[in-house]
Swiss-Prot record:
One of its GO terms (biological process) is cellulose catabolic process. InterPro entries: CBD_sf (IPR035971), Cellulose-bd_dom_fun (IPR000254), ConA-like_dom_sf (IPR013320), Glyco_hydro_7 (IPR001722), Glyco_hydro_7_sf (IPR037019). GO terms for molecular function: cellulose 1,4-beta-cellobiosidase activity; cellulose binding. Residues 468-489 are annotated as: Linker. GO terms for cellular component: extracellular region. Residues 456-465 have a biased composition (Gly residues). It catalyses: Hydrolysis of (1->4)-beta-D-glucosidic linkages in cellulose and cellotetraose, releasing cellobiose from the non-reducing ends of the chains. Disulfide bonds join 497-514, 508-524. Keywords: Carbohydrate metabolism, Cellulose degradation, Disulfide bond, Glycoprotein, Glycosidase, Hydrolase, Polysaccharide degradation, Signal. Residues 19-467 are annotated as: Catalytic. It holds the Pfam family CBM_1. It comes from Humicola insolens. This is Exoglucanase 1.
Length: 525
């Protein structure tokens, strides 16, 4: 947490029974609009807002302005135990621009890396899209697609401008945990597949037991408990490298873990927890194409990028494929093809993940935690959208943009980006690139094909690199396309059966019909 101290106003306390919310600084969520689309390609603007994660907020006594947490340490005279700390301390409202470097404009969100405020220096931020004042906006991604624009031109080696989904409670844990009185309005309830133990309040209690300040982060530490849930990394990136990664968990929603049994980054036993901390990642550089993503490359990171991610069902209605493509300069750019022998393809499937783990010699915790099918269960349920900017005190972000492990050069899968292995040291990045920022904008969500219906050059995602005319936009479902039966393979229920550039089966197994959703995507329904 990046602490701030404001010592002039009187606290306005919401409750005196548990983890509190105070208002020495009035909480005003910055507005951020997004678009909800229908199968016909019609999109409706949703006027929404964002909130800041509670871990970044000023935590002080409910009776005044004395810090409960300063630097990376708790005040044990106030916080004698987990429950009394939650009772005596509150998280406060945020001055989004001046303290945290967070600004919005219409459908655009900018997150600045380092912000020097009147009382503190803030590093990084984590924000959530809201549905009203007191709930997070949730998305059910399975069978749908999610699209956004991003500008990573101003974030380099060692930084991560991330957009992802986690299975956290829509109310921030307010209804499940009586000790939590702050809720989603104040950014509570975070969890992810690393089962992070640096969260200050978990399940409505302070994570004070066993808390140890970090040796290389003056603002963070780790406690006895962690908080776990399924995670779908749509976008982890800087201007040198990018990856998208599903992380299944055997327990989908938020759950608390203890000590090394949490697994993940914060524990000595990385794979001991209920979640897969590694996931099954698609990083174009790691998959052999070193000229696809970067400055002046096929996907040019000096310009704004439109990122489209589709979550396609298989014949059984489970998650079958995660497909990615890009739009830039008015044309579709299919995701790069993997050139690793035995790991061909440009999308994530169960078979692709199986082959990648073997080719790279990685521990296959992905399958241990349920693989694509288990990830699909999370995607079928409500997930919360997270947008953040951060540096990495554990491994200098080398796992994203350099060679990792650093002594594994030449080993299949070790080279993930062109950044030097000496890059990404947080103290250096914070000193040398404080004005770095990432901009997310033009968020769109809806059925397959709906979010790109109006985009110039939007063809079949991942199958056609040309520039076909934009699809026809209608307000009703397109008529079913019927074909004459003939020999050959047939697509199962939910599978793709047609579209611009599609080369697979165009007939469906009985009794399903190949139904045109738009010019570039037909599906067996």
């Amino acid at each position: 947490m990046r602490t701030a101290k404001f010592a002039t106003l009187a606290a306005l306390v919401a409750s005196a029974a548990a983890q509190q919310a105070c208002s020495l600084t009035t909480e005003r969520h910055p507005s951020l609009s997004w678009n909800k689309c229908t199968a016909g390609g019609q999109c409706q603007t949703v006027q929404a807002s964002i909130t800041l994660d509670s871990n970044w907020r000023w935590t002080h006594q409910v009776s005044g302005s004395t810090n409960c947490y300063t630097g990376n340490k708790w005040d044990t005279s106030i916080c004698t135990d987990a429950k009394s700390c939650a009772q005596n301390c509150c998280v406060d409202g945020a001055d989004y621009t001046s303290t945290y470097g967070i600004t919005t404009n219409g459908d655009s969100l900018s997150l600045k890396f380092v912000t020097k405020g009147q009382h503190s220096t803030n590093v990084g931020s984590r924000t959530y899209l809201m549905d009203g004042e007191d709930k997070y906006q949730t998305f059910e991604l399975l069978g749908n697609e999610f699209t956004f624009d991003v500008d990573v031109s101003n974030i380099g080696c060692g930084l991560n401008g991330a957009l992802y989904f986690v299975s956290m409670d829509a109310d921030g844990g307010l209804s499940r945990y009586p000790g939590n009185k702050a809720g989603a309005k104040y950014g509570t309830g975070y969890c992810d597949a690393q089962c992070p133990r640096d969260i200050k309040f978990i399940n409505g209690e302070a994570n004070i037991e066993g808390w140890t300040g970090s040796t290389n982060d003056p603002n963070a530490g780790a406690g006895r408990y962690g908080t776990c849930c399924s995670e779908m990394d749509i976008w982890e990136a800087n201007n040198m490298a990018t990856a998208f990664t599903p992380h299944p968990c055997t327990i989908i929603g938020q759950s608390r873990c203890e000590g090394d049994s949490c697994g993940g980054t914060y524990s000595n036993e990385r794979y001991a927890g209920v979640c897969d901390p590694d996931g099954c990642d698609f990083n174009s550089y790691r998959q052999g194409n070193k000229t696809f993503y970067g400055k002046g490359m096929t996907v040019d990171t000096t310009k704004k990028i439109t990122v489209v991610t589709q979550f396609l069902k298989d014949a059984n209605g489970d998650l079958g494929e995660i497909k990615r493509f890009y739009v830039q300069d008015g044309k579709i750019i299919p995701n790069s093809e993997s050139t690793i022998p035995g790991v061909e393809g440009n999308s994530i499937t169960q078979d692709w993940c199986d082959r990648q783990k073997v080719a790279f010699g990685d521990i296959d915790d992905f399958n241990r935690k349920g693989g694509m099918k288990q990830m699909g269960k999370a995607l079928a349920g409500p997930m919360v959208l997270v947008m953040s900017i951060w540096d990495d005190h554990a491994s200098n972000m080398l796992w994203l943009d350099s060679t990792f492990p650093v002594d594994a050069a030449g080993k299949p899968g070790a080279e993930r980006g062109a950044c030097p292995t000496t890059s990404g040291v947080p103290a250096e990045v914070e000193a040398e690139a404080p004005n770095s920022n990432v901009v997310f904008s033009n968020i769109r969500f809806g059925p397959i094909g709906s979010t790109v219906a109006g985009l110039p050059g939007a063809g079949n995602g991942g199958n056609n690199g040309g520039n076909p005319p934009p699809p026809t936009t209608t307000t009703s479902s397109a008529p079913a396309t019927t074909t004459t039966a003939s020999a050959g393979p047939k697509a199962g229920r939910w599978q793709q059966c047609g579209g611009i550039g599609f080369t697979g089966p165009t007939q469906c197994e009985e009794p399903y019909i190949c139904t045109k959703l738009n010019d570039w995507y037909s599906q067996c329904l």
